[in-house]
């Protein structure tokens, strides 16, 4: 179990051990510090000389324009593979008053437990490691032959025993693709079962331009998971679909506005909304009385998202997005709720649910 009740209250398991939930402070709820996105990379079209150069070269300034419109063209761009750079970059967040990061790189995407611990020691940040499995194309081969119960056991093992001595403290990001395949549903069901038994938050990757949120919540509820401890990630692209987002929040889910600062066209999916649209959507949710269901982050997962390579980095929300929210009418107390209170309450959700939540999973599948 990674959220524990002791004499001082609820604690959250970080890569360096448990910390009181009250010490999470300003928290980014969906980030990547180390990853390997090799399976997202695609080669350049035949005859595209510039594309071939970009695909096989280290990221550099003259590539940025094209990579904003095709970020997976560069093999180098899709991996965060330098711990020293990660320390340098996330230290900017710490210097602005940041305290905690939910690092939701799952197994199969280059999760690096020992490196996360090194980053935590170097920066003083609370880093909470994720677990589980992402989109089907990234699932390790051994997962494909497993049952729901078997996958749930694997997830629970990362939470209770750890990986190389480092325990996960959150489940996710669990991958759901536009096709929402049977394998992805299997893993989601397993994640919900593991959540019910370990009582930790669950973070689900949604394809932001497709409306799978309700189906995801239905699966979680069927397996005994707690919707109030579930984050639906990548809600920025549906920010103008207010009926959809209100319905998800009303069911109790957290809405992950975790694409702040992105300026990318994902060719197979869509264009990331700009920060002005993100801020307007969040301000509307706040006025609708749903600000307590919103979580913020930047989902840094490409080299070009790092400051070193011309991106906005991990401190973007504190440096630029919070002032933008204030211009949209939110107060400092409101943005504190988004960045401090809501992440804390996510980890308190099981305690708050009390006897209302009981696991009713089917362990025979």
Please tell me what each predicted stretch does.
Residues 30, 101, 133, 195, ...:
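Divalent metal-coordination and catalytic microenvironments
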Residues 29, 43-105, 109-123, 150-166:
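Alpha-helical scaffold segments that flank or form the walls of functional sites
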Residues 203, 257-259, 290-311, 335:
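Short acidic/histidine-rich active-site segments
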Residues 3-18, 22, 316-365:
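Mid-to-C-terminal alpha-helical segments outside catalytic/metal-binding sites
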Residues 37-39, 113, 212-218, 241-248, ...:
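Histidine/acidic-residue-rich catalytic or RNA/ligand-binding cores of hydrolases
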Residues 100, 118-122, 126-201, 254, ...:
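Active-site gating/metal-coordination segments in enzymes
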Residues 32-81, 131-149, 299-307, 311-322:
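Active-site gating loops and adjacent loop-to-helix segments of metal-dependent hydrolytic enzymes
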Residues 114-117, 142, 181-186, 209-224, ...:
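Distinct, well-ordered alpha-helical segments
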């Amino acid at each position: 179990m990674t959220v524990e009740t002791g004499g001082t209250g609820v604690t959250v398991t970080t890569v360096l051990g448990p910390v009181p939930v009250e010490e999470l402070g300003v928290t980014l709820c969906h980030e990547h510090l180390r990853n390997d996105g090799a399976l997202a990379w695609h080669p350049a079209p035949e005859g595209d000389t510039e594309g071939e150069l970009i695909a096989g070269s280290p990221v550099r300034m003259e590539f940025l324009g094209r990579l904003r419109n095709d970020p997976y063209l560069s093999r180098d761009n899709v991996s965060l593979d330098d711990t020293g750079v990660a320390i340098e970059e996330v230290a900017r967040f710490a210097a602005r008053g940041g305290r905690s990061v939910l690092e939701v790189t799952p197994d199969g995407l280059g999760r690096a437990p020992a490196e996360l611990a090194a980053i935590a020691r170097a920066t003083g940040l609370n880093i909470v490691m994720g677990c589980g499995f992402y989109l089907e194309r990234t699932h390790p081969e051994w997962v494909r032959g497993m049952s729901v119960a078997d996958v749930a056991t694997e997830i629970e093992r990362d939470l209770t025993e750890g990986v190389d001595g480092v325990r996960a403290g959150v489940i996710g990001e669990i991958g759901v693709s536009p096709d929402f395949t049977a394998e992805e549903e299997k893993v989601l069901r397993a994640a919900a079962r593991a959540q019910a038994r370990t009582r930790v938050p669950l973070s689900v990757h949604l394809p932001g331009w497709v409306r799978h949120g309700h189906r995801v919540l239905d699966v979680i509820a069927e397996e005994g998971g707690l919707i109030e401890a579930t984050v639906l990630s990548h809600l920025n692209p549906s920010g103008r679909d207010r009926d959809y987002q209100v319905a998800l929040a009303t069911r109790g889910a957290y809405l992950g506005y975790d694409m702040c600062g992105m300026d990318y066209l994902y060719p197979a999916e869509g264009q990331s909304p700009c920060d002005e649209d993100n801020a307007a959507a969040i301000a509307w949710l706040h006025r609708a009385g749903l600000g307590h269901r919103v979580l913020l982050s930047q989902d840094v997962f490409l080299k070009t998202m790092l400051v070193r390579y011309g991106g906005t980095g991990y401190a973007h929300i504190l440096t630029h997005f919070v002032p933008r929210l204030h211009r949209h009418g939110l107060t400092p107390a409101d943005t504190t709720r988004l960045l401090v209170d809501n992440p804390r309450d996510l980890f308190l959700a099981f305690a708050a649910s009390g006897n209302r939540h009981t696991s009713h999973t089917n362990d025979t599948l």
